[in-house]
Amino acid sequence: MQLHELMDPDYSDNPFPLYRKLHQQGPLIPAGDKIIISGSHAVVDALLNDRRVGKNYMESVRVRFGDDAAGLPLFQGISRMFLVLNPPDHNRL
């Protein structure tokens, strides 16, 4: 499984073949440097509810678009959005 498969137009048209592939490859699938994908609802639910797990949005921008991209206004703005914040900032609402 590669991260770019999620960006493929075929995925948008019919995601089910990729979903099958995710389930066949197991609960945690490496998809790039420091990127793990899961097609398991139970695994994703457990991770989202585990306070030890966080996300690093800007690191994912650097990996995907290069070091300079993290300084672009677009990514700086997104990095302050509620959905990409970790606790305690995410919990303030």
Swiss-Prot record:
It comes from Enterobacter agglomerans (Erwinia herbicola). Transmembrane segments: none annotated. InterPro entries: Cyt_P450_sf. This is Uncharacterized protein in aroQ 3'region. GO terms for molecular function: heme binding; iron ion binding; monooxygenase activity; oxidoreductase activity, acting on paired donors, with incorporation or reduction of molecular oxygen. It comes from the Bacteria.
